[in-house]
């Protein structure tokens, strides 16, 4: 598909981009990844799912390698809601249990999130920061861990609620954009008063 479906016209009309990818991260051209990164800085919301923590745009926006531990062993995941007042946690129970999911484990090499909404525990013993938020420029980013392709995770009503909440949270505010760069004319008039004749040695 030309431009991976992410040409300028499409991105400029996109309020929130949801990204799921696996294995083929390196096949996304660098210029496409940079295009997505710039749109996030300009205000587009970006929701990154599961193994997409290694996709080029997310890695660029985080500035770290974004790697973690993982294991495929059909283990249970319990997703704890640790910020129940956060908009992404709206209408959720205290925790969500997934009978089978891929296990992820700390350390997760990401910058400290601006907000951490979910933490996951796995029956194999690992824990993981599974719902994390950042702001970059004018854009909002949400990483959500569950979603291995071998399991029906995205058919769960609670997971769909999280994704709907995340889209609502990440959408642009469409407020005024800041002026950046040199401003030659001051916003307020500057009056310079010469007091040199008032001082005598």
Where on the chain are the PLM-derived regions?
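Short acidic/histidine-rich motifs immediately flanking catalytic phosphotransfer sites
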Residues: 10-18
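Short amphipathic alpha-helical segments and helix-helix/interface helices
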Residues: 33-37, 131, 163
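Solvent-exposed loop/turn segments at secondary-structure junctions
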Residues: 4, 23-26, 52-56, 95, ...
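Extracellular ligand-binding/catalytic regions of CAZymes and related secreted enzymes
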Residues: 128, 136-201
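A short, well-structured beta->alpha microelement
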Residues: 1-8
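A glycine-rich, often tryptophan-bearing local segment used as a flexible ligand/cofactor-contacting loop or short
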Residues: 26-92
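Catalytic beta-strand/loop cores that center a nucleophilic Ser/Cys/Thr
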Residues: 12, 60, 68-143, 194-200
């Amino acid at each position: 598909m030309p431009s991976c479906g992410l040409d300028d016209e499409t991105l400029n009309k996109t309020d929130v981009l949801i990204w799921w990818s696996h294995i083929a991260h390196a096949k996304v051209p660098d210029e496409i990844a940079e295009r997505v990164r710039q749109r996030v800085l300009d205000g587009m919301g970006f929701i990154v799912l599961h193994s997409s923590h290694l996709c080029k745009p997310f890695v660029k926006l985080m500035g770290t390698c974004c790697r973690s531990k993982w294991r495929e062993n059909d283990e249970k995941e319990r997703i704890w809601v640790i910020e129940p007042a956060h908009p992404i946690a709206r209408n959720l129970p205290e925790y969500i249990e997934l009978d089978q999911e891929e296990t992820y484990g700390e350390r997760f090499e990401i910058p400290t999130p601006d907000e951490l909404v979910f933490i996951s525990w796995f029956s194999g013993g690992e824990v993981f920061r599974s719902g994390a938020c950042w702001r970059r420029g004018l854009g909002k980013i949400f990483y959500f861990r569950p979603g291995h392709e071998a399991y029906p995770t995205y058919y769960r009503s609670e997971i769909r609620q999280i994704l709907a909440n995340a889209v609502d949270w990440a959408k642009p505010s469409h407020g005024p954009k800041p002026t950046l760069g040199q401003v030659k004319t001051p916003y307020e008039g500057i009056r310079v008063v010469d007091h040199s004749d008032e001082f005598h040695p």
